[in-house]
């Protein structure tokens, strides 16, 4: 059953919504017009034309004061602006770093020959080796007061070397690093599968199989075959004895 006879409910709802929107729009327009029509209030701080005499009187009184006189407010501001005298000691600027001088090092070899080298405190042990022994830095060992200088990244300044100090230098003849020795009681393992160690057990197994066939099937083995088998057995026994002899 429809709300209005002859008119669908959808049309009725649409016109109702449009009517509500129209009423709201008219109400908003009327409110905006009423707010825009109100006169702006005049600020209270703005001087009115009726007060020129008071302003002129105040200006004349300020001009009549002595030029050297200061108001209490200005005097207070001047005192606040003056810096307070410091009571502590004045900070002295840090002295500039003294320039570093190069180190003079005496490299002493095993044959009592010496070589003078100059280096900076920030240079490392590795850079000293590369400079004095180019291409042989891996073969050079430096010793200072019985201590091996093995850390190539250590700087010379961290060692606190005195002037004209002596560094004992040992030059090795080997190019590569030596292989670490095997601990006692241990032997190096085989690098891979050794076929020679398996050949002799296979031959022994084959020899046992032939002797088994010779005993079980004697008619098939003539005298020459038996003698050949015996000679092969003797040869294989001598070979096994030579290989496994302590």
Swiss-Prot record:
Transmembrane segments: 11-31, 195-215, 221-241
Tissue: Ubiquitously expressed with highest levels in mammary and thyroid glands, bone marrow and spleen; limited expression in cardiac, pancreatic and ovarian tissues.
GO cellular component terms, semicolon-separated: centrosome; nucleolus; postsynaptic membrane; recycling endosome
Ranges for domain Ubiquitin-like: 103-176
InterPro entries: TMUB1/2 (IPR040352), Ubiquitin-like_dom (IPR000626), Ubiquitin-like_domsf (IPR029071)
PROSITE patterns per record: UBIQUITIN_2
Gene Ontology BP terms: ERAD pathway
Disordered: annotated segments: 34-101
CDD domains for this protein: Ubl_TMUB1 (cd17131)
Annotated stretches, region: Required to release iHOPS from membranes: 2-30
Source organism, top-level taxon: Eukaryota
Chief subcellular location: membrane
Keyword tags: Cell membrane, Cytoplasm, Cytoskeleton, Endosome, Membrane, Nucleus, Phosphoprotein, Postsynaptic cell membrane, Synapse, Transmembrane, Transmembrane helix
Subunit structure: Interacts with EEF1A1, GRIA2, GRIP1, CAMLG, TUBG1. Interacts with NPM1 and CDKN2A; TMUB1 can enhance interaction between NPM1 and CDKN2A and is proposed to bridge the proteins; proposed to be mediated by iHOPS. Interacts with ERLIN2 and AMFR; TMUB1 promotes the interaction of ERLIN2 with AMFR.
Protein name: Transmembrane and ubiquitin-like domain-containing protein 1
Species of the source: Homo sapiens (Human)
Organismal lineage: Eukaryota, Metazoa, Chordata, Craniata, Vertebrata
Gene name for this UniProt entry: TMUB1
